[in-house]
Amino acid sequence: MMQIKYLFALFAVLMLVVLGANEADADCLSGRYKGPCAVWDNETCRRVCKEEGRSSGHCSPSLKCWCEGC
């Protein structure tokens, strides 16, 4: 029974490490892109995100500009 508790604790710590690592690569909404962002606006979204200091950007199905590498 003690081994299961230690295994669970190790699993919980590993999950925190993995989730923390993924957070660094998460996307965030652009703060400067105005208006709806459709598929044909991808280049504009990328440019605005790069101006914000992000690695790139893309338009989502919800018509928002998401910057990558936040």
UniProtKB/Swiss-Prot annotation:
Tissue: Hemolymph (at protein level). Synthesized in the fat body and is secreted into the blood. In larvae, expressed in the visceral branches and posterior spiracles of the trachea.
Pfam family, any one: Gamma-thionin
InterPro entries for the chain: Scorpion_toxin-like (IPR003614), Scorpion_toxin-like_sf (IPR036574)
Glycosylation sites: N42
Propeptide: 21-26
Domain of life of the native organism: Eukaryota
Gene3D superfamilies named in the record: Knottin, scorpion toxin-like
Stated induction or repression of this protein's expression: By bacterial infection (at protein level). In hemolymph 6 hours after bacterial infection, levels of expression increase for first 24 hours and persist for the following three weeks (at protein level). Up-regulated by septic injury caused by the Gram-positive bacterium M.luteus and the fungus C.albicans, and by M.luteus or E.faecalis-derived peptidoglycans and by B.subtilis or A.oryzae proteases. Up-regulated by Gram-negative bacteria in the respiratory epithelium.
A Gene Ontology term for the protein's cellular component: extracellular space
UniProt keyword list: Antimicrobial, Disulfide bond, Fungicide, Glycoprotein, Secreted, Signal
Subcellular location, record wording: Secreted
Record-annotated disulphide pairs: C28-C70, C37-C59, C45-C65, C49-C67
Gene Ontology annotations of biological process type: antibacterial humoral response; antifungal humoral response; antimicrobial humoral immune response mediated by antimicrobial peptide; defense response; defense response to fungus; defense response to Gram-negative bacterium; defense response to protozoan; killing of cells of another organism
Extent of the signal sequence: 1-20
Known role: Possesses antifungal activity and is active against a relatively broad spectrum of filamentous fungi. It inhibits spore germination at high concentrations and at low concentrations delays growth of hyphae which subsequently exhibit abnormal morphology. Part of a psh-dependent Toll pathway, which may function in activating the systematic immune response in response to localized melanization of the tracheal system.
Protein's recorded name: Drosomycin
Organism: Drosophila melanogaster (Fruit fly)
